[in-house]
Amino acid sequence: MATTRKDLRGRTLRKGEMQRSSDKRYAYSYTDPLGRRKYIYANDLVTLREKEAQLTKDQMDGLDIYVAGKATVNFVFDRYMSLKTNLRQTTRSNYLYMYDRFIRDTFGKKKIAEIRYSDVLQFYNYLLDKQGLQANTLESVHTLLHPTFQLAVRDEIVRKNPTDGVMAEIKKSSEQTTGVRHALTIPQQRAFMEHIANHLVYCHWWPLFTVLLGTGCRIGEALGLRWDDLDYERRTISINHSLVYYPVGESRNSVLHISKPKTEAGVRTIPMFDTVKDAFEMLHEEQKESGWNDVEIDGMSGFIFCNRFGNVPNPQSVNRAIKRILADYNAGEEVEAKKQHREAVLLPDFSAHHLRHTFCTRLCEKETNLKVIQSVMGHKDIQTTMDIYAEATEEKKQESFERLAATLDIF
């Protein structure tokens, strides 16, 4: 016959409860879903039973807080990515790159069950203030973390999604226009290109940046261009594929691949301006003398752009080059400004995608037909075109008003 277990004060203990004689603390033992023995402790019996009640509630909800406590954000994100079987390889590559760069080695190591709303808010503010992330980049980080936590909610690992409402708070407190890439001004654009053209180290980048600023191509579309995509007679460029760079295998080493456009709008023919034609002809003459690019990627060859190692450049290397060029330009500008006793005119930080946005802005300043702009840019959604057009025309309107105010005296 089973004996009734009692505490040191003679009170009857329930199954799994005990009181240790060494420190008089109460304990409750149970077996988790993985068959492991677990314990919870309290200094008094009332508190212990409150913890037991909470544990029972969690178990009835299909949630064991102790098992959940072992799962990190990294674990849940990797699980989330493994379930996203319909992702394009380009998108998957971008997701993994963003996560590994900004989340995995810091916030990703935290136990997901211990993260609260304030933790997420603090992390986002850290990325903005300490890491210098732009608002649109933070949006990309949020795009990864929110569905990761949502999966944890659906799997009943956590009760609520701690990322809910965080971006709204960030926008409210910082008053930033998130997700908007601003174009370079015409003086900034000219300063950037003139610096490259006249620089002994960076001048080899001039053709690529000329093509980017003169076509509005996405960086992957530009790097993937082949000589067969050019029609000098019709002065057109065929955009029908893109170059992507993503990690593969357990080593996570990144390799170049060819990707088809995400939408039908991405397949398009765009005009070849004179300066862009000059850039292509310059590269054609160089390869004619030094040897044609013989790199083959997924069955495609004859690529226009080639680095000093004989390989096709990857998008990340282009963005790194932009950062080096900007740093060099701004450092030189500060020296010159000091010599001339004037304020330095520095170039802002930007990426290759800003050059696409810059081209679109210049196009919007000259062209009023939104469907033409949408076709050239390959925008799936006309709203994207309209947003850029509205921003560009608003700036032009302000310039017109300023000129009018300077010449027209009606008072």
Model region roles, listed by residue range:
Residues L243-Y245, T358, M377-R403:
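Catalytic-site neighborhood detector that most strongly recognizes the C-terminal catalytic loop/helix
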Residues T3, R234, Y245-V267, D274-V276, ...:
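C-terminal secondary-structure termini that scaffold catalytic or DNA-interacting sites
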Residues A135, E139-T143, R154, V158, ...:
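Basic, Lys/Arg- and aromatic-enriched nucleic-acid-binding interface segment
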Residues M18-S118, E285-M300, E394:
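N-terminal DNA-binding module of tyrosine recombinases/phage integrases
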Residues Y39-L45, G69, M81-P162, L200-C203, ...:
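N-terminal core-binding DNA-recognition domain of tyrosine site-specific recombinases/integrases
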Residues E194-W205, I270, E286-V295, M300-V312, ...:
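Short, basic (Lys/Arg/His-rich) helix/loop patches that form interaction surfaces
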Residues K38, D44, T236-S238, P247-V248, ...:
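C-terminal catalytic core of Y-nucleophile DNA break-rejoin enzymes
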Residues M1-S22:
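Short N-terminal "domain-start" leader segments
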